[in-house]
C-alpha cells in the first residue's frame, strides 16, 4: 500500500512543528529542515547533514519537497525572466524583475481568474482552481533556485514578492496566508512585511479577514474613479463598489504597520478610456481622504483585446494633474517588452499551443478510426 507523502512546502512553521511531533520527533526539527528547504533550496533529505540518519530515512518514506516545474522560460534583454510553471496538469505564470536595488518576484495565486476584468489576459482563460500552499510558495522556491540561493549570508536573490500574477489572491486566503507566513518567517525567506505585497481587485470581506490574520503591504486595483466606469471594466464593482472598497482599505491600513499608514493605488491607463485630465482630477478628489501612493500603469496590449496603450504625453498629463494635488505618483516602467508583456499572456500562449496539439492529435485519431 502506497502512503501519500506530505509535501513539506504545504506546511508553515506551525504546521511543520506539528508534523514532526506526529513523527515522534522534537518540534525544533521543523526549523532545522526549513533552513535546508528555504535558505539552501534543498529538496534531497540525504543532503540535510545536521539531521540524523534515522530521521532522514523516515522523511524519505513519508514526506517530499515538490515545487512547480518550469515548462517555458522567456528571458528579456533587460534581465526580466518570465516562466510558465506547471501546477498539476496546468500552468501559472511567475515573473522575476531585477532592478539596481531590488529583485521582485511576481507570483500567481490561482489557475486563471473568476473576476473577468475586461482588460486582463488571465481573465480570458476563465477560472480553474485555487493554488495550494506549496504551489504558491513553490514559485518562490523554484525562482530562488534558478536565480541563485545564497544561504545564510550574501545578497538575496529575491528581495520583494508581489501577489500580482494570475488570479485574485483574496479568493484564496486559506492557502495564501500560510504561504506568506513562509515568506516572512526567519526560517523561510525572512522578507520584511513591507516587501511582501498583496494586490486585490476589491473582495472586501476577505480584506477584513486578511487584516486580522497577517500584516503585509496592500495594493489595490482601482483603475477608475467612478462606479459606472469601474463596473464596465471590473464586474466585481457591482458587488463591492468603490466606496465599500475604500472603506475596507482604510480599515486594513488602520491595522497594518507594513503599509505605514498608506495604501498603494494601482491605476491602469487605457488610451482614451480612463486617462483624460478630467478623470485625473476625478481620481484626485476621490482619494483625498485615503492616504495613498499612486502607481500608474500604461496598458500592455495583447491579442484579442481592443484596449490600447496611451501615448507618453497622455500619461504625463495624467501624472501631472495628480502631482499638482500633492500625491506621490510613480509610472510603472515597461519591463520585458521583448517578451510577452501582459500578465497571463505566456500561459495563454502555452494553453493555446496545447489546445492546437490536442486538436491535431484528436483529428489524427479520428482519421485512424475512420481508416480502420
From Swiss-Prot:
One of its GO terms (cellular component) is cytoplasm. The keyword Ribonucleoprotein does not apply. Its EC number is 2.1.1.192. It catalyses: adenosine(2503) in 23S rRNA + 2 reduced [2Fe-2S]-[ferredoxin] + 2 S-adenosyl-L-methionine = 2-methyladenosine(2503) in 23S rRNA + 5'-deoxyadenosine + L-methionine + 2 oxidized [2Fe-2S]-[ferredoxin] + S-adenosyl-L-homocysteine; adenosine(37) in tRNA + 2 reduced [2Fe-2S]-[ferredoxin] + 2 S-adenosyl-L-methionine = 2-methyladenosine(37) in tRNA + 5'-deoxyadenosine + L-methionine + 2 oxidized [2Fe-2S]-[ferredoxin] + S-adenosyl-L-homocysteine. The keyword Oxidoreductase does not apply. It comes from Psychromonas ingrahamii (strain DSM 17664 / CCUG 51855 / 37). HAMAP family: RNA_methyltr_RlmN. One of its GO terms (biological process) is tRNA methylation. Keywords: 4Fe-4S, Cytoplasm, Disulfide bond, Iron, Iron-sulfur, Metal-binding, Methyltransferase, rRNA processing, S-adenosyl-L-methionine, Transferase, tRNA processing. PROSITE patterns: RADICAL_SAM (PS51918). Belongs to the radical SAM superfamily. RlmN family. [4Fe-4S] cluster binds at residues 113, 117, 120. The gene is rlmN. Residues 99-338 form the Radical SAM core domain. This is Dual-specificity RNA methyltransferase RlmN. It is found in: Cytoplasm. S-adenosyl-L-methionine binds at residues 167-168, 199, 221-223, 300. SUPFAM superfamilies: Radical SAM enzymes. The active site is at 93 (proton acceptor), 343 (s-methylcysteine intermediate). Gene3D superfamilies: 1.10.150.530, Aldolase class I. Disulfide bonds join 106-343. Specifically methylates position 2 of adenine 2503 in 23S rRNA and position 2 of adenine 37 in tRNAs. m2A2503 modification seems to play a crucial role in the proofreading step occurring at the peptidyl transferase center and thus would serve to optimize ribosomal fidelity.
